[in-house]
A protein has these predicted regions:
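FAD-binding subdomain of flavoenzyme oxidoreductases
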Residues: 3-16, 25-28, 32-207
């Protein structure tokens, strides 16, 4: 099975969020570019835009915690996930739901909360029994390394399943993403190219 289902953008009430949030459901085998195009057709932005968008699939984006240019505004895959489903090493379903999504970068919240639900993998996820549940509360600062952003060396990420694990703790099968609207006004800044990164980085930081 290729897991290529992709739905249209739809508003959803997310756990712990008062207002409806525009979301997009995809299975793990959908090519990233198709998700971008589906969101764009509805007037929204899918924030996970790696340079491999024409070749990568969203399940891989979750497993790698992929990002791209839009990560500057809305973060990486983790920041934009409302929910995801995977198969754990024992063959059971594991569904992870973000509680109180801030619709922005996850490290901006003091504590990020996730509800984990394991279901019997011998039956389809919508028609099987719940085996157990668990709640994870992880300090938002855990997900970013000060001064560097995403810490690719941290595969544990506070015990959060699936994200940045590169497939080591299970197989991603589907997800529901938060999508965004572009700001009404944008500002473009033109920068000179410097020969050395040590010269360029302080210059960028000084721009206000």
């Amino acid at each position: 099975e290729k897991l290529e289902r992709i739905d249209k953008v739809e508003p959803r009430l997310l756990p712990g969020v008062e207002d409806q949030v525009p979301t997009l459901f995809t299975e793990a085998g959908v090519v990233t570019r198709r998700v971008e195009e589906t969101a764009h057709q509805a007037g929204f932005v899918f924030a996970v835009d790696p340079t491999s968008a024409d070749a990568s699939v969203v399940g891989g984006n979750i497993a790698m915690n992929a990002g791209g240019k839009k990560a500057v505004l809305w973060g990486t895959a983790l920041d934009n996930l409302a929910w995801w489903r995977m198969v754990d090493p024992e063959g059971n379903w594991l569904e992870v739901t973000r509680i109180g999504h801030n619709r922005g970068k996850i490290h901006d919240v003091p504590v990020a909360t996730f509800e984990l639900t394991w279901k019997d993998g011998r039956h389809p996820p919508g028609a099987t029994r719940v085996l157990r549940t668990e709640r994870l509360e992880i300090p938002g600062s855990t997900f970013r390394k000060v001064g560097l952003g995403k810490d690719v060396t941290d595969k544990f990420l506070g015990g959060l399943p699936g994200i940045q694990k590169e497939g080591c703790d299970g197989i991603i099968t589907s997800a529901r993403w938060v999508v965004h609207r572009m700001p009404a006004h944008i500002r473009t800044v033109c920068l000179e190219f410097f020969g050395q990164a040590r010269d360029a980085i302080p210059a960028i930081v000084e721009i206000r």
